[in-house]
UniProtKB/Swiss-Prot annotation:
It is an enzyme of class 7 (translocase). It comes from Paracoccus denitrificans (strain Pd 1222). GO terms for biological process: cytochrome complex assembly. GO terms for molecular function: ABC-type heme transporter activity; ATP binding; ATP hydrolysis activity. One of its GO terms (cellular component) is plasma membrane. Its main location: membrane. Part of the ABC transporter complex CcmAB involved in the biogenesis of c-type cytochromes; once thought to export heme, this seems not to be the case, but its exact role is uncertain. Responsible for energy coupling to the transport system. It is found in: Cell inner membrane. Keywords: ATP-binding, Cell inner membrane, Cell membrane, Cytochrome c-type biogenesis, Membrane, Nucleotide-binding, Translocase, Transport. This is Cytochrome c biogenesis ATP-binding export protein CcmA. Residues 4-207 form the ABC transporter domain. Gene3D superfamilies: P-loop containing nucleotide triphosphate hydrolases. It is a peripheral membrane protein.
Amino acid sequence: MNLLAVRDLAVARGGLRAVEGVCFNLNAGGALVLRGPNGIGKTTLLRTLAGLQPLVSGVIEAAPDAIAYAGHSDGLKPALTVTENLRFWAEIFGGRNIDAALEAMNLRDLANRPAHALSAGQKRRLGLARLMVTGRPVWLLDEPTVSLDRDSVALFAAMLRAHLGRGGAAVIATHIDLGLPEAEILELGPFRASELRRQSRPAGFNEAFG
């Protein structure tokens, strides 16, 4: 089942074209990893796919209400507790699975703590747990492991693999190995996207993600 299709997409940042020629199909259970140097346009591409900024040209096809985006901002309500934040987003998106989200990102012991009292890593875990309560099948993830320690990265990797196993899909900008050897890679170079290639299991692959 095709969840996201992109054809000859061009995106711009600050009025200047950043990347063009982006083409891919993302099916149920599929993952696409965006690679490229800092400033090449990965965030711009993800924001365009999420509908947060206009495309320059090309086509983006996705079912209505299919996409959930996790960017550099965690989107938390500081005065609300961890559980209340998840409930807020579940109500906004019409989703559920609050208990499962707490469990997935090891937030149960923090359930009643206000978001403003969380550490940077805890806030990031809550921001990622928010994805589970949206009910959206396509996750767009911009450097999702920032501020996470090794154990939290493993938790997120497990949550992501479970999402894919349930028929979800993801586009991820990351240089961290998340244990997705079946993922396709899209290398972004100056102004142009490369052909898709399969991710190979890298040397030093962390068996905790295998």
